[in-house]
Swiss-Prot record:
Identification of the protein by name: CTP synthase 1
Naturally occurring in which organism (per UniProt): Saccharomyces cerevisiae (strain ATCC 204508 / S288c) (Baker's yeast)
Enzyme class, first EC level, given as a word: ligase
EC assignment: 6.3.4.2
Recorded family membership: Belongs to the CTP synthase family.
Activity profile over pH: Optimum pH is 8.0.
One Gene Ontology cellular component annotation held by this UniProt entry: cytoophidium
Taxonomic placement: Eukaryota, Fungi, Dikarya, Ascomycota, Saccharomycotina
Quaternary structure, from the entry: Homodimer. Oligomerizes to a tetramer in the presence of its substrates UTP and ATP.
Pathway: Pyrimidine metabolism; CTP biosynthesis via de novo pathway; CTP from UDP: step 2/2
Gene that produces this protein: URA7
Annotated keywords: ATP-binding, Glutamine amidotransferase, Isopeptide bond, Ligase, Nucleotide-binding, Pyrimidine biosynthesis, Ubl conjugation
One of the record's GO molecular function terms: ATP binding
Length: 579
């Protein structure tokens, strides 16, 4: 097993996740099987109870793991299916060690950070790195490990020490370190001092970088590269220029141009890994396909405007998978994506009194959009604005997609506007109102007292119901009888109201295996009005966009029927690579 660690210095949020994913993707172009692990040095067990405004999106895995958003990047770039164990947190590893101590596994020893916690981290990495994650079912050849946060912070100290020991445990030829640093541009001059200080700090902790990936707003000058190489004790070929590009999908090609993969190939002796000719050819085809697909970002195309009506619009990372699913779909439809970020509260009548400018700007974005999207979320804030946006889409025949909360919002709006039940709402927001007005109810099997890990999580089947041959979403899925998508919710549509809703035109075309829990709703006489209880964005890939999102973009661009008929499929045929 070969290990490539990606760490960061100077500041967090510098792009380690994209660089780690891009490095893994380049490894795949050699025909290698690649897996990935993310280390998050926070005390939370997982990301399930963290605010999206503080830490970005919570990404849900097949096994129900609620993880850091970077695992979504890994799955999208590498075409793999990870597990909750591929995300190591401080809380998770401490709980593991404490549980072992309680069992008596340490035989009366004084349990310490070194060696017990650091050994547990190393054992965890070695165990998880061997888990098959792709369709071959075989053990991976390479494991990419991203160390979250910033090296030097007190939170990451145990993990840095564990990795320092780990490099000797696995051997130099099996361990490489890429350190991502910031090169700011001040008054037109590229400054290297932050990178010099970061590398000095890294070396003082016992880790020596094999490559330094320099993040900069512009292309690095040769004198800057030479200066970093000289003062950081590396060769110029070990300094990689990772400047801003118009799409993160270009980063693998940027690294390829600078021969990063050639250096790692020699440094890790990758030629010692036995590969079949079929695997090598598969890697070459992957690279060719990636170049062809990402090239769509550079072409001049018609623009499709999607109004994203959300609650966490101040931090775009809160909706990272949604953004990526829209990007994947727009590439397939050969359209330029223009997301209009609409804060849901700005659509509400109260906003007209408190801030008329924001109110009119928000409604202008909604009313001029080609399509409207309401993504997932929790809590009552902004829900009335979402209801108004859903009504606008329904009444004005604007393509609409609701996800999780979006499905519940669409149902509440329909119940109020069409059924005439003006007081209808969700038990999540108003638990004390008359139960007959609860359109959305708490699922009976869910623990009401515990927040963390208590939702309906992970990959679950949805079955298309009888007499739904007309359904656009069913056609987008290829007229299959069932689909498997990832879930994350505590509330569901009130089963007692389903018959009345369907009799008035709101059809639940997809339900769970019991036939009672509603998973997909659709309006029959509408260009595209779809909502899902599950989160289809979590399984979207570059060459295989999420079908509900693809339908939204296609309908918004006026090409839905062409997309359903396969006229926008890749000329080369099927996606062999699952990314």
């Amino acid at each position: 097993m070969k290990y490539v660690v990606v760490s960061g210095g100077v500041i967090s949020g510098i792009g380690k996740g994209v660089l780690a994913s891009s490095t893994g993707m380049l490894m795949k172009t050699l025909g290698l099987k690649v897996t990935s692990i993310k280390i998050d040095p926070y005390m939370n067990i997982d990301a399930g109870t963290m605010s999206p405004l503080e830490h970005g999106e919570c990404f849900v895995l097949d096994d129900g793991g609620e993880t850091d958003l970077d695992l979504g990047n890994y799955e999208r770039y590498l075409g793999v299916t990870l597990t909750k164990d591929h995300n190591i947190t401080t809380g998770k590893i401490y709980s593991h060690v404490i549980a072992k101590e309680r069992k008596g596994d340490y035989l009366g020893k004084t349990v310490q950070i070194v060696p017990h916690l650091t050994n547990a981290i190393q054992d965890w990495i070695e165990r998880v790195a061997k888990i098959p994650v792709d369709d071959t079912g075989m053990e991976p050849d390479v494991c990419i490990i991203e160390l979250g946060g910033t090296v030097g912070d007190i939170e990451s100290a145990p993990f840095v020490e564990a990795l320092r020991q780990f490099q000797f445990k696995v051997g130099k030829e099996n361990f490489a370190l890429i350190h991502v640093s910031l090169v700011p541009v001040i008054h037109g001059e590229q400054k290297t001092k932050p990178t010099q200080a970061a590398i000095k700090g890294l070396r003082s902790l016992g880790l020596v970088p094999d490559m330094i990936a320099c993040r900069c707003s512009e292309t690095l000058d040769k004198p800057t590269i030479d200066k970093i190489a000289m003062f950081c004790h590396v060769g110029p070929e070990q300094v990689v220029n990772v400047h801003d590009v118009n799409s993160t999908y270009h980063v693998p090609l940027l690294l390829l141009e600078q021969k990063m993969i050639d250096y790692l190939h020699a440094r890790l002796k990758l030629d010692e890994i036995s590969l079949t000719e079929e695997e090598k050819q598969r890697g070459l085809e992957l690279l060719s396909k990636w170049k062809a697909t990402t090239g769509n970002f550079d072409e001049s195309m018609e623009t499709v405007k999607i109004a994203l009506v959300g609650k966490y619009t101040n931090l775009k990372d809160s909706y990272l998978s949604v953004i990526k699913a829209l990007e994947h779909s727009s590439m397939k439809c050969r359209r330029k994506l223009d997301i209009k970020w609409v804060e849901a509260t700005d659509l509400e009548p109260e906003a007209q009194e408190s801030n008329k400018t924001k109110f009119h700007e928000a409604w202008n974005m909604v009313s001029t959009a080609d399509g409207i999207l309401i993504p997932g979320g929790f809590g009552v804030r902004g829900t009335e604005g979402m209801v108004l946006a859903a009504r606008w889409a329904r009444e004005n025949h604007i393509p609409f997609l609701g996800v999780c909360l979006g499905l519940q919002i669409a149902t509440i709006e329909f119940t109020r506007s069409v059924l005439g039940r003006k007081d209808s709402h969700s038990a999540e927001f108003y638990p004390d109102i008359d139960e007959k007005n609860h359109v959305v109810v708490f699922m009976p099997e869910i623990d009401k007292e515990t927040m963390g890990g208590s939702m309906r999580l992970g990959l679950r089947p949805t079955f298309f119901q009888n007499e739904t041959e007309w359904s656009q979403i069913k056609k987008l899925y290829g007229d299959v009888s069932e689909v498997h998508e990832r879930h994350r919710h505590r509330y569901e549509i009130n089963p007692k109201m389903v018959d009345e809703l369907e009799n008035n035109g709101l059809i639940f075309v997809g339900k769970d295996d019991t036939g009672k829990r509603c998973e997909i709703l659709e309006l029959k006489n509408h260009p595209y009005y779809i909502a899902t209880q599950y989160h289809p964005e979590y399984t979207s890939k570059v060459l295989d966009p999420s079908k509900p999102f693809l339908g939204l973009v296609a309908a918004s661009a006026g090409i839905l029927q062409d997309v359903i008929e396969g006229k926008y499929d890749l000329e080369a045929g099927e996606n062999k690579f699952n990314f």
